[in-house]
Amino acid sequence: MTRKRVDRRTFLKLSGAAITAPGIAACAGTNKVPTEGVPRSRFDDESTAEEVTAGIELGGKIAVVTGCTSGIGYETMRVLAKRGAYVVGTGRSLDKARAACSSVIGKTTPVALELSDFDSVVACAEAIRSMNTPIDILICNAGYLGAGDGTEVINGIEKHFIVNHLGHFVFVNRLLDRLFFAWQGRIVVVASRAAYTSAPDAGIDFDNLDGRYAYKGRSAYGQSKLSNVLFGLQLGKLLRGTRITANSLHPGVINTEIDRNLNRFMQLGFAVMTSLGGGKTVQQGAATSCYVATSPLLGSTSGKYFEDCNAVTVLGNSHMQDEAMAERLWQVSTELCRDFLIEHRQPNRDDFEKGLRNSKSG
């Protein structure tokens, strides 16, 4: 007997929408359209990372993947390495990163990265910089999803915001010049549909970044994911005219270790949903990251948001295309992280050509 696949929306209706974990909430009333000017791919929500990279040769390319120790981060690293890329994989501990990297067929290097600790972020970035090589692909994949039953604050900032956004904000800043030296650098920010299903109605609450007022874990997670999308939007704007692109994406609902901090009911919701076919496998969940990072169709696409391997525009009051909010987020993030950031100048032609020679000879 063939089991019929239950789509995510039908599953939520059948369950009475009882599962309220971020990113699982039904999107009834949300209108999404294909983004104009971006080539459509033939891939969809059932495509896997191996399928979307079939025939793509990444030999000589350097990729950095944060959160490589499990889930879609591990699968992303595995597939990129399989296609020939040299992958630097990060984990919260060096032992975990080393174990993940050693189990992958291909060239990898493990580095420790704790996104909630900016000193760790700087140390990780400096270790990668010391490799003295261009970076072709930088995938900001690591993330945090809290239990939702209380505010956790780190250095005066709510944990979702500091781990999911600010940590990567510093990380990208410290590695940006290495992407300038690549033939065509790509920054991929793994966000979530929670950016428009769970974020505060007014968008990012800049006056409550410590979560002290009316804290709700789901809203805090959604706010951090909206920050990911706006980070990609602003990066795309600031990098216009360069060879670097930046895009964000929703990987899908996947039963991975990101739910380890949820209560048992919510963890059960993730497991049941994926087992019934309402979610994605890890192989499918890594597909959009790998597609955005490698597709020849997207060489000049920047500042866009992707779902199921295609760029989409979310209509309505989602704030995902709010350029003023994106600019303010950049300014606030810069102020909060000022002591850990470095200033950049765009490399001149001699610098750039030297970087290209190093990239091609690597």
Predicted regions and their residues:
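Residue-level signal for the nucleotide or nucleotide-sugar donor/cofactor binding architecture
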Residues: 6, 92, 116, 279-287
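C-terminal tail/cap regions
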Residues: 298-362
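Rossmann-fold NAD(P)H-dependent dehydrogenase/reductase core
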Residues: 17, 34-257, 266, 338-350, ...
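N-terminal secretory signal peptides and thylakoid transit peptides that target proteins
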Residues: 1-19
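C-terminal helical subdomain
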Residues: 121, 224, 273-313, 323-328
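Generic structural signal for alpha-helix termini and adjacent loop/cap motifs
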Residues: 30, 131, 295-298, 340
